[in-house]
Amino acid sequence: MFDTARIDHTGDVHVFAMREKGCAVRDVVWAEFHSPAGRLVRRPVSQLLREALEEREPVWKPVQYRGKQAIATWWRPAGAARHAGCATLEALAAARALEFDPEVATFTAWPVRLSWADGGGTHVPDFFARLADGRARLVVRAPGGTASGDWPEVLPLLDAAGRQAGWQVRVHTPADTSVAEAENRRRLSRYRHARLADAEAARLLHAAFATPRPLTEGVAATGLPELSALAQAHHLIWKQDLRIDWNLPFVPARSLVWTSTASRAMA
């Protein structure tokens, strides 16, 4: 996460630069994004505090062509009407991590293009997230191989954008999660959608897992229909309302599941 700084609202890039200690006009970051009406606009990032970029259309999409190493795929955040684009499998993992983060309310892909005021260097972050407390977060995936050539120039741009707009900035790398946790997230993410939520089933499942036990055993103890109860239990695990050891491969017939109260008792 990068540090944040005071947010200027004057709308004058020269005034902003003079008020920021040691900040020249060329160091001001500009943002290109779509207005609510769909018009492409460009402003200093310091003016974007009240812009709901998580609701805006992308300013960029990957071009697909034969022989390209990266892929273009899509992720639908739970409760969102629009899919978020992912240019690579690494970006897909970053989207899954955002979905899993309880701080994140919603997010979208590629809604803003950042550039220096003097026109030198541009970058489109992978994701823009709105947090539950109203703050904003930029998420970018760390490039690998030949794609990392411009990375030393991108990082200062992201850092400055975060400070001037008051955004968090996170760099997602594969090392952020263990292999087992990444695979568990991939498998359980299919149960993320709110349509699987059921208050009565949740009550019975919490009671069943008040003592740690394997998933299938606890589901059977609820007396609920097996298939629907399994789906609802997986949903609660994804939402982290039921706990598992994410760093071990999750096997429903063997892996222990418990409630937060049970986890305290185990400790």
Regions flagged by a language model, labelled:
Residues M1-A267:
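Electrostatic, structured charged patches in enzyme active sites and in nucleic-acid/phosphate-binding
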